[in-house]
Amino acid sequence: MRMLYFFDICRKRAFETNEAKKLKKNRAAGIILSMKILNYKYFLYLLIITFSVNFFADNASILKSLKVEDGFKVEIFIDEIDTPRQIAESSGGNIFVGSRSSGKITVIDTNKNTRVIAKGLSNATGVTYHRGDLYFSEVDSIWKISNIDNVLKNSSAMPKKVLVTDNLPSDTWHGWKWIDFGPDNKLYVPVGAPCNICNPSMEAKYNFDKRYASIMRLNGGEWEHVARGVRNTVGFDWHPKTNNLYFGDNGRDWMCDDMPDC
């Protein structure tokens, strides 16, 4: 039963205030929480990204601030991974975590021991497990480790990663990627917009790639568009019956408290 979902904490962008400067200076590791349906064996892993050690006083206050319906319980799963972003679970129970700032892919085994299986990456946020293989993303590349559970079981060495593609745009603004395989067994990858509110006057500056602001699908080594006008999706999934694709999109900045009254 596949129950992996992504959650992100929205923050203000008033970076000139003293408090905001503290947040930028003290940007720190996140925690991964698990939410389980009581009396059932299935777990829903919630990924919470915290931008500062000062954002919440401690883990206890985080748990206290979360409200869930009767029959649910939220507890800390692990709290030692730097800026966790996307997670994926293998058939063997290993949990893989992408990180936005550490440049590492980490595995959490069934005993909650952690191990770095890839490092030195650029915004290695996206991870997905498909047919026994692990896939993970950088800004302009997708990598693969085949037969990942057996590799981890049989060797303590750093697994060998194989390049799937390295021809994606290299812009880091909205360049980090949530990745997943669809019901058609094809790899879906977003390409974010390289600016806040893009307009035609910026095309020369950014040398606009037609894949910007879209969700792409890798089909036989070629990229094809699935959705356009998607500024920066930070999560997507498919309806289990209709196979319709649903996604969240991180919209333009400065539209929260600065938005004018209607």
Question: Language-model features: where?
Answer:
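Methionine residue identity
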Residues: 1-3
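Positively charged N-terminal leader segments that act as targeting/secretion signals
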Residues: 14, 23-30
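Short hydrophobic targeting helices and cationic amphipathic motifs
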Residues: 6-7, 27, 33
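Beta-propeller domains with acidic blade repeats across secreted/periplasmic ectodomains
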Residues: 58-262
